[in-house]
Structure formats: C-alpha cells, structure tokens
Regions:
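Short, charge-rich amphipathic interface segments used for partner binding and complex assembly
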Residues: 34-66
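Extended, charge-rich alpha-helical interface modules
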Residues: 13-23, 57-77
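N-terminal acidic leader/helix
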Residues: 1-37
Length: 77
C-alpha cells in the first residue's frame, strides 16, 4: 500500500477527474436528463471540494492541473 503519493500522481488524478467532468457537461448538453445534470453537478462538487482543500493547505490548484477558469463550463449553459 502506498502511504504517500507524489505531486505528479495527484495532478494526474485531478486532471483525469477534470476531463471526465467536462465530458459529463457535454453529455448533459447532448441529452439533458436529470441523471446527466446530477452527474455534472457531482463532478463539480468533487472538484470544488478538492480545489478548496488545496487552497486550505496553501497549495496552488494550478499546480495540480486546475485551469484558471475551471468552473466556467459548469455555469455557461
């Protein structure tokens, strides 16, 4: 079991979640169902939580793959 992870590994995981989140937004636009809306919202909540925790730990979210406007796709419908 890995007790610690390096920053690159954490960045890779976060970037993957961001990618899946943006895909969920596209799915919601193509097929606006309550499931797809809920899925996109869930990704936003996860990413927002991680972003906030990074800031609390005095880490720059950009160093972990967050673009400056990472929230914009969630709110530009």
């Amino acid at each position: 079991m890995i007790e610690t992870m390096d920053k690159d590994s954490v960045r890779y995981i976060i970037e993957s979640v961001i990618e899946y989140a943006y895909e969920s937004i596209e799915d919601e636009k193509k097929e606006p169902t309550s499931f797809n809306s809920g899925r996109a919202l869930a990704y936003w909540e996860v990413l927002d939580t991680i972003h906030t925790r990074l800031e609390i730990c005095e880490q720059n979210p950009k160093d972990f793959g967050y673009p400056d406007d990472w929230e914009k796709p969630f709110f530009s419908k």
